[in-house]
């Protein structure tokens, strides 16, 4: 059953929805607590890093269906922890200031880079580590999964910076509240059609490999990547189409505490 492409598609969809939701939930809970709670979240999540590294290493020589799933989950675990560290404000960048209005485009770009520089450096380092580990490995899907997530995320960030009609900031945590000033709500730029076209073509290429490859494990691996690429494409369209994507996770979120609530908690009232 785990060798079924449908099972791979369902797993990818569920993992995308659940992992996004649990990270957003944990960040909101920490937002409602103290500043230390965000750091605690990242520390509590450290086993994900250990599990991800161990799983990625164990999957390198295993091209079975189980090995493919292990590689995929390893990459998702590493990615999930890095995203948690970013959204918690622990690993971000040297610039934590809002972007002033009417800043020149080049200045605005480097300010935006400064808000995420350390986070991007960690992503690149992890990607390079997985790449080196899988150069001669039978199972490259841990690297493939992480690389796909990385490229899709870079594309999304660039589109948010250059301009898209819809930007959902209601889940933006307090440590990253300054990021909203670096986004641009407006008409799409030339990058958006390039991004969605590239993701569409790559999804089709991955689907072709999933259908035509004879090895059952490889077929599952390409199916997982196809679904992940289609979800990345969907996330890009969420930036343009008037779809209530926030409803997928909003019901999971505890109510955000007001500043008054925080002051009362601090005074024990």
What are these regions (language model features)?
Residues 18-21, 77-92, 147-165, 227-242:
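Transmembrane alpha-helical segments that form the membrane-embedded catalytic/substrate-channel core
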Residues 112-167:
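Hydrophobic, aromatic-enriched interface-forming segments
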Residues 1-6, 54-73, 129-144, 205-223:
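Helix-coil boundary and interhelical linker segments in multi-pass alpha-helical membrane proteins
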Residues 65-119:
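Intramembrane catalytic core of multi-pass membrane enzymes that act on lipidic substrates
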Residues 41-61, 78-82:
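A generic, lipid-embedded transmembrane alpha helix
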Residues 18-21, 184-269:
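C-terminal transmembrane-bundle signature of multipass membrane proteins
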Residues 11-28:
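N-terminal signal-anchor/start-transfer transmembrane helix
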Residues 91-108, 159-183, 246-257:
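Cytosolic, membrane-interface loops and tails of multi-pass inner-membrane proteins
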């Amino acid at each position: 059953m785990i060798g079924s492409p449908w099972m791979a598609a369902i797993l990818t969809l569920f993992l995308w929805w659940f992992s996004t939701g649990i990270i957003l939930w944990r960040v909101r809970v920490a937002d409602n607590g103290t500043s230390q709670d965000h750091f605690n979240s990242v520390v509590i999540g450290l086993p994900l890093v250990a599990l991800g590294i161990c799983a990625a290493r164990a999957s390198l020589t295993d091209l079975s269906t189980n090995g493919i799933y292990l590689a995929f989950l390893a990459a998702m675990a590493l990615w999930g922890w890095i995203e948690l560290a970013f959204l918690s404000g622990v690993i971000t960048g040297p610039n934590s200031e809002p972007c002033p209005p009417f800043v020149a485009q080049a200045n605005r770009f480097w300010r935006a880079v400064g808000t995420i520089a350390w986070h991007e450096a960690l992503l690149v380092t992890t990607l390079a580590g997985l790449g080196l580990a899988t150069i001669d490995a039978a199972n490259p899907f841990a690297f493939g999964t992480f690389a796909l997530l990385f490229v899709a995320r870079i594309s999304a960030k660039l589109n948010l910076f250059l301009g898209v009609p819809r930007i959902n900031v209601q889940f933006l945590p307090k440590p990253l509240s300054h990021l909203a000033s670096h986004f641009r709500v407006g008409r799409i730029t030339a990058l958006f059609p390039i991004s969605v076209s590239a993701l569409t073509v790559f999804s089709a290429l991955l689907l072709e490999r999933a259908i035509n490859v004879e090895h059952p494990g490889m077929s599952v691996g390409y199916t997982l990547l196809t679904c992940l690429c289609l979800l990345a494409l969907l996330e890009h369209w969420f930036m343009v189409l008037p779809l209530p994507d926030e409803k997928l996770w909003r019901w999971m979120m505890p109510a955000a505490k007001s500043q008054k609530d925080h002051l009362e908690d601090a005074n024990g009232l």
